[in-house]
A protein has these predicted regions:
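N-terminal module of bacterial RNA polymerase sigma factors
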Residues: 1-23, 30, 54, 108-112, ...
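Sigma70-family region 2
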Residues: 6, 46-61, 83-84
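Conserved RNAP core-binding helix
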Residues: 17, 25, 35-52
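Structural recognition of an alpha-helix C-terminal capping motif at a helix-to-coil junction
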Residues: 40-47, 62-74
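Arg/Lys-rich amphipathic alpha helix in sigma70-family domain 2
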Residues: 55, 70-90
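DNA-recognition helix of helix-turn-helix
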Residues: 73, 137, 143-168
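Internal acidic/polar
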Residues: 86-113
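A short pre-motif secondary-structure segment
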Residues: 125-129
Length: 172
């Protein structure tokens, strides 16, 4: 790789980190519930993106955000499967959440706490749809599933959250 090409790759990665770094970090935190691990996962996400940038560039029309979220979710999944992760204290409080979420209203903090308590398959679509403003198509691509599966998981998660937040007294 010549110096010009390397510099172009570095510039592209710097732009991606500036543009999507916060979103990747939030996603990693919600998946891992640990600020330090989320930062490590974010770094690993961008390292994998750097290593595979050529493959991404061959995919015409692919979204950087969707590609990065797919990598981040896989990195988080690998972290959770590791033996070391099983020994991490998962009783973190919401005060550990980075990026100004602590300034949220008490109702918002309660909702976030309930979202964090959802099973992974339901938590991921909620996180990506409501907290990362991704479309159903982008979420489906990031999760490697169909749009209808994403839609169904969103509805199921919303139903569970509605029951949790209303104490089961919701008739919709």
């Amino acid at each position: 790789m010549d110096a010009q090409t390397r510099r172009e790759r570095e510039d592209r990665m710097e732009t991606m980190i500036r543009q999507w770094g916060t979103s990747v970090l939030r996603t990693c935190f919600v998946c891992l519930s640990d600020a330090q691990q989320a930062e490590d996962a974010m770094q690993e996400t961008f390292l994998k993106a750097w290593r595979n940038l050529d493959q991404f560039e061959k995919r015409n029309g692919a979204s950087e955000k969707t590609w990065l979220m797919h990598i981040a979710l896989n990195v988080c999944r690998d972290y959770r499967r590791s033996r070391w992760y099983r020994h991490v204290d998962m009783s973190r409080s919401l005060e550990d959440i980075p990026l100004h979420v602590n300034d949220a209203l008490p109702e918002d903090r309660e909702l976030l706490s309930d979202v964090l308590s959802l099973p992974e398959k339901l938590r991921q679509p909620i996180l990506l749809y409501y907290y990362q403003d991704m479309t159903l198509e982008e979420i489906a691509e990031a999760l490697g599933t169909s749009k209808s599966t994403v839609y169904n998981r969103l509805r199921k998660a919303e139903d569970q959250l509605r029951i949790t937040l209303t104490g089961g007294d919701c008739y919709v």
